[in-house]
Each structure stands twice: as structure tokens, then as C-alpha cells.
Amino acid sequence: MKFLKLPQSYHNGGIHSIDVNQDNTILVSGGTDNKIGVWNLKKLIELSKLVSTHNSPEVRLKLKSLEPKQYITCHKSLINVVRFFKGDNKRFISSDVNGNVFFHTLHEQPETKQLFPFKSIETSEVNPVVDLTISADNRLIAWSTNNGKVYLYDVVKDTFQELTSICHEKPIIQRSIAFDPSNNYLITVGDDTQINVFQYSYEKDDTSTTTYKFRLIYKISKLFSQNPLNVRYKRISWSPDGNLVSIPTASKNQTMLISLISRSEKWTNIESLVGHDFACDVVKFNPKIFSSKENDTSKVHSVIASGGSDRTMAIWNTSKSTPITVLQDAVQGEILDITWTTDGTSLLFCTSQGKLCIGNFEPNELGYTFSQETMERFVQLQNNLIEPMNFRYPHEQTVGNRKQLPPIEFLSQKNAISTTTSSSNTVENDKKNAEDNVGVSNQSKSTTTTTTTTIKGGVITPEVIPPPKLQSLDDDIDGDGDDEEHKSGGMLDSVMNDRTQSSPRKLNKPKPIAPVVSDSTTQSLSFNKQKVTTKNGKRRIQPMLISSGNSAPSDLPRSNSVIKPVVNTTKSTMEFEKPSYSVSEEFYKQNKRPRTEETTGSNNNKKLKREMEPVKFIGSVILNPNTSFSKIRLATPKVRLFFQLKSKTDDDGVFILDIKNGSGNESKPSRLTYMKKDKEIWCDFIPKYIQLATEGSNFWAVTTVDGTILTYSHVSGKRLLPSIVLGSPISFLESYDKYLMVVTCIGELYVWDMEIKKNVLKSSISPLLELYNKEGLVKSDNITLCAVTSYGIPLVTLSNGSGYLFNKDLGVWQTITESWWCFGSHYWDSTQTGNSSGGGGGSGGSNNKRSLQTMNMFNDEQSIIELLEHKTNEEILRKTRTGRGKYFNKISKNMLMKEGFESLENTISISHLENRILCCELLGENKDFHKFFTTYVQRICELGFKAKLFEVCDELLGPIDTDTAKPPNENNWEPKICGFDKRELLKEIITSCSQFRDAQRVLVHFGKKIGVVIDES
């Protein structure tokens, strides 16, 4: 494959959709500049092939000057979809984020027609288009919107209709939709991971034309477990034979994959394309079917191109589980759309940075292609497997005691809205067609002059209607009192039938309708006698309407041989309390849905069994009653059935500590095994539950549920110490290098040096958690991180964002970071990466190899202070859901405007830097110390804090031979700080801060003493 990325950006730096016509001569593109670009595709492909063979300056100049041959301007917002009609060279559809859909025909002067919104609904709400597709016969256009609905547009009959009205579920955004190549199915993928499969067909109507009919046949909800919602687009694709559907951004057990659903295998997942770690948002099948050998139809395969937000393009062969070609970091920005030329030899894709890329394949590089006749035969083979529209699928069969199947629900074009007629005619025709669907044909030889209100949208709201005062009918009806009863009964019958319709209608003057000849089996209703029918060998008594029990029979003939009872149970006279909220509201709603919506069913099981999950935990830690009333009570980890730890001193990950818990007694002890790959090195058996484990530089340590610590040699498994008994279950077990740290559930803190086998410190974390409160025992902040450094210094972070270290010399906890610094310091890094400019890396989410384990937290490239400040950022964002901007806004509004608070931010910034420097001294962070110290001195020089500068310089200078005024305890002065020579730091400060005029007098004074400045006098 030869790959070319055009050097310049198009559409104001964002191309969101591209497509190619049938003869590969035109490429259309749309993006952020609200324009549609029309490209000469032949010239584009020829130029891309020329670059790969003759990369001359003339060719590169042609590339830089390459532009669309013309632009079409009709949209007023971002264009997110452009699609050519199948097999067409001139006509295509475009849509934008404002919900507009346009029809285009390419000529010298392109013709454009707005399909949606049309006049009769332009006053209603129009929602942004999410995705759009065109049927294989170029008759139907379907698009989804961000309110969870899918709409159909018939370009032949100019009708418009909502498809999702037959789903009867809470609207969920359908992120991608696609018609199949065989013109039988429409598939949609929602943000709730559910895939809806619609089947449709055409049937002749009374006007010798055909109308479509849709039906929801499958709901696939167990294909994948997660669905990333942060993707801008998700574009699914059908295989050219109509058998496979590729679903991107699927996730199963934290693994990103592309799922292939097979239509011939009853819509099951037959293949998952895995084998790489990057995300995939857009997929596109090659329009050709390939084989490994020429004209060999026994082993065929398709080719898929996939791309997404990770800037990676992959080419897949459906017969293989791994990609055949991967272009990593090929472009800058997300890959938003992919298209193939119709001959399958060129691949084009666009990015969010406005780049257009082309990949050209050599003949037979992807495989041997088949002729058009063979391709049609493949499609016909799939069409032979299509079930009729009235077919009952297995999940729709009767289960248990259900004797009668519910009716199949169809969406008929008879109920669609015409886009060419006026609003009143549209509603009138809609009402007439709706009445035909329920089997009622209202006839009259005269017209009724009834005045009603036009309803253009929304749901009909029931209201109390007073007894109608009917106007006299024209001709053919007598004016006696019996006719009044006849008219009243007719109106009631009409109202009851109208209420069964889903779309609002307007009662206009009905035109005279020719008499309809009913079937020989047509029976007229008698309102004075209940009707008895026989169905499936059982007598059915039709209920009689009370309001029409004494009315005269209607003259209106019925078109159905058996009149169905009026079923209108959506409104009830009783009200019920909602079920207990211990049951999910979504559960009992879905439990009441009709059987036709169930996606799974069984003829054998009357009651669905809950799927069994593997046992992850085998119990909880039992606390001693004496310690359960402690002032500090920390949570303890649950006891796991088994777990493994990979050795962090081994880069290959072949050494593993495997722990399998038994029954917690002598009859079945827990097993502790250290292995190299599958080979056992050493093992031990413990008659207790093992709770936690950690690894040091030369030891392994495990804890049991009763608070006992066992230590082993790293290599041989020899016991290093007798069992350490703490008496309380352990909440945190951490280690780094030669240090082992333990925090019990009652807040006791221990740190041991395992080389010399001595206790380094014993303290408690209660000062961090015991906050004063009048109400006594309250819930305090959670511990979010507990670790130990290479110097044996404990570190703790809390859920309020504060981070602490324990000073062994002072015997107290000291603050490293808190949210106050984020509140007003200029030097706070509020980014979420954990890496500030010029500093070491924290435990950011961008590096998958880093974890919050102590062993991997404090390596040479990482900064402890930046890590803890990153934890503060996480807690602030988690609690407030806002960034630093909101805090800064609070300062500017509430404090900076007040008298006496003008220097608030400068003061906070200086305090923040001073705290950083002091913590670096305690933690031994040499690299961070130099960076923070240099920044601090420059800042106090800039602000003119001469006293602070003098004190800093005096400390760095120390005692000198000529200075006899120093106090006698000056001999305690250390010449180095954090590995840096103090006087060298002083020289660096004098030279770097000399440009600040307010500090020059102080700097010159110390410069003379250290010999940097020569006194000419």
C-alpha cells in the first residue's frame, strides 16, 4: 500500500465526512466551514500514485496547490454527513448539526433542494442529525437525531415518518445507522449498547404504486458490555454481500474490539477483531469480496478499514483475527470518516485536523476480486435466507401458559406525512389512512361542516368534552330525533377509533366518499345486543358501549369480517403507588413491555434464570469487638479467592507470586507459590486467609485476616522474621526498596527497615482523620493513597485533596499539598496529566504502565510532590466537576475586589513555593528542589521582597573567614542542601536575578562577599 497525506488542511481545519460516486470520478467532502467540497477524484488518485514513483518538486507543488474544483454553499452549520446515492454519479445527500438535510444534483451549476425540515413542520423542533444512510434502491433516506429518534424520508413519494415509534422504549441516541446492500434491513446502534434490527419490504397499494412497511425483528443487547460515550462519531458498515455488519467501539471485559454480526447466523457475533490496543470509532467494508486464489469461491473474505480517535488506521482481513496493516500516528487528529473507491483499490479517509489521506493498493494485494455477476450471486444467496415479514421469530413464540401471540406491529407508509401538500391536507390524509388501518371506513353521501383546530405535532392530551351540539347534515339524512342519536353514536365511534392512533390528527370537512362494497362476510353492528363470536373454539362476547347501548345502529358498513373489540387500556380509573425503589425503576418498566419486544426467549424455561458470576470474594474480615469501638475505623479489603502479583523487579513479568486461599483452617490451608512462568520456585502453606501481599527489593510480605505479617526472602522463600502480630486487620500494606509500611484498621502506622530488621517509626494516622465535630462520631475523609518513599517516609492523601508526610525528626504529620494552593497559587498545575512543565511525571492516566502501587510510584523520573498535587486535582474535579477556572473566578469576585486583599494571589503563590521547597528538603527531591528554589528566588526578586531575599542569600552564604560577627552556633551550617552546594546556588541566583532592579542592592552585597562582584574601591 502506498500512503499519501495531503500537506494542507481543508474545510477550516476539520473534514467530518467524505464519499465517492459510482464511477470514481468525484469525491465530496464536508466539514467545519459549512461548505461541501467537490473534488476531481481521478486527478487526486493519479497525483497520489505519481508521488510514490516520482517525488519531484513539480509534483510536490501540484500537491500543495490541490483544491476542490468547486464548493456548494447551502448549510449554515457544520456538515457531518455526505453520502452519494448507490450506483449514482451525480446525486448525493448532506446533513448538518442543525438538523437540515439537503438533496444535491451535480451539474455545471449544482442543484440543491432542502428535504428537511419542510414547510409543514418548520415551526416544530428540529434536532441535530447524528448519522444518515441511504437504502440500496435509493428510495429511502434514514437519519438519527440527538433526541433518540430515527426518521424516514421517501424521495419517490415525498413522505416523512418517524421509525422509532414502534420501539416503545426510552429514547436513546442512535449513534450509527445503515441500510443493508440487499435492500431488506436497517440496523441502528444506540449509546446504550443495544442494536436494533429493522426489516422492511414494499407492497402494492390502491394506486398501483408500492409503499414500504417496517418491522422491528431483533434487539441485540448482550454483544458488548461497554460503549464509550465520548466518541464524536460511530460509523458501522455492511459487507458487500449483506451478510456481515461491523460494529466499532465495542468493549468486552475492558478490551476494545470490532464485532462482526452475521445475518445468516441469526444475528450473532461470529468474530471479534482484536489484537491491538487502540480505539476504533469508524469502520468501512471494502466494496469487493476477495479470495486468496483466483476464482476460488470456497474461501472468500472481506476487507475492513478501521480508524478512530487514536490517529491510527488499520486494515483487516475477516478471515484473520489480527490486522494485516497498521498505520500508527499516521495523522494528527481523529479519523472521522472512511470511504473506498468502488473498485476497491483506493482508500480515502479524513481527520478532525482537516487532512485528507489516500492509500493505494497494488493489484491483488488484498486478494483476488470477483466479477460483478459473482457479486450479485453472493447477494442473492443471502436474499434466499430472508424470512417473510410476518414470520414469527423464536423469541416471539408463546412461553408457558400464554395461548395467544400478540399481533406483529408494523410501521406502514400509509401513516406517513406528505411533504408536498399543505398542512391541512397532510393531516386529513393522515387521518383517513389511519382509519383504514384499524378497519373503519366512514362513509357518507354528504359533507360535514365541522370546525376543528389544526394539530401539527405532539401527543393528544385527553380533556373533558361537553355533549356535542351537532350541526345538521346536508341531504340524505332525515332531521328527526332518531338521527340525532345516530349522529351521536357515529361521533363516539369515530372518537374511540381516533384514540387508538399514535399520531395527532385534525378533523376537517370530509369529502364525499364513494360507497365501498363490503365482503360477503361483513356483519353490521347491533348496539342493542352484545355480539358473540367464536375464536379458537372459544366463545368471545364483545363488550357493549354503555353510551351507545340505546342508540340506533349505524349505517356505516364495516370492512372487516370480524369486528375487534375496542382496546383502549392506556388510561385507567385507578392510581397506584410506585413500586419500592429497592427495585430499579427501569426494571419494572421493562418488565411490563409486550412480548414482541423481548429479544430472548425459550420454549422450555418458564422463568429466566439469573446468570451465575464467578466468585471473586469469599468473605469479609472479622473485627475484634475491642477494636471495633476505636476512634479511627478504616475499611479493610475483602478476602479474595485467589490473586496474583507480578514481580516488579523483573521487566519480562515471568516471576509471579500466586496466592490461593483455602478454607482458612488446617484442613484446607491457603497456598502461597512463587513461580517463574509455570515452574514453581518456592511455596508455603498458611492455615489462615491471606488478605494482602507486596514486594520489596529483597523480600515478599503477606498479611492474614487477623493482622499477622509474614515475610519471605525474595529468591528462596526463606522466612526473614517470625510472624509479626499486630492484633488488628490491616488496611494498607505498602513497600518500597527496603522499607515495609503497614496501616491497620484502627489507624496504627508502622514502618520497618527489612535490611537491618528494625522498626523505623511507629505512629498513627488519627491526627489526619480526627476532625472536631460537636455531634461526636462522624464520617471523616477517606484515605485515597498510602505509600512509603525510598527514605522510609510515609505519605498519605485524603479525599479532601490534602497530602501529608510524616516527619520522623519532629514526630508529626506535615502538609505537602492542599486545595488552598490550587485556590490561588500561580504555580499550581491544574492539568490532569500529573506532569508539569519541566518536571518529572506523576502517575498520570496517559501511561498505562504506571500504577498507584508504591513500587512503581517513586522511580527516578517521577516527582512525589507533583504526584500528590495531581491527586489534589483529581479530588477537586471529582467533587466540584469544575476546573481551576471556577476557583479563580471566586477569588476575583469575592476577595480581590476587597480592600486589603489586593496581594492575595502573590502571597498564596509565595507560600506555595516555600512549602514545596521545604517538602523537597524532607523528601530528598533534588531535581524538584532546584526548579522550585530558582522559581521562588526569581519571584521574590520580581516582587521586591528584600527581607526574604536577604535571608535566603545569607543562609546560602554561610560563615566566611572575614566575618567575625556570626554567632557561635553558626558552626552547624551545612554546606549542601538537597545535594547542591549552597554557595554555587548563591552564585547562580546572583547572575540569574541581576536584572531585577529592586533586588540589585542585596545581590551586589552578597556578590562582593562571595567574589562574584569585584569592588573597584
UniProtKB/Swiss-Prot annotation:
Repeat (WD) positions are 10-49, 74-117, 124-163, 167-208, 228-271, 275-326, 330-371
Q: Where is this region: Disordered?
A: 417-561
Where are the annotated coiled coils located? none
Indicate, by first and last residue, each region the UniProt record lists as having compositional bias (Polar residues): 518-535, 545-561
Q: Does the keyword DNA-binding apply?
A: no
One Pfam family here = Hira
Which segments show compositional bias classed as Acidic residues? 473-483
**Superkingdom in the source lineage:** Eukaryota
Cellular component terms per the entry's GO annotation: chromatin; HIR complex; nucleus
**Alphabetical list of SUPFAM superfamilies matching this protein:** WD40 repeat-like (SSF50978)
What is its subcellular localisation? Nucleus
Q: Name one GO biological process term.
A: positive regulation of filamentous growth
Key word Ubl conjugation present: no
Q: Could you tell me the keywords of this UniProt record?
A: Chromatin regulator, Nucleus, Repeat, Repressor, Transcription, Transcription regulation, WD repeat
What exactly does this protein do?
Answer: Required for replication-independent chromatin assembly and for the periodic repression of histone gene transcription during the cell cycle.
Similarity-based family: Belongs to the WD repeat HIR1 family.
Task: Specify the protein name.
Answer: Protein HIR2
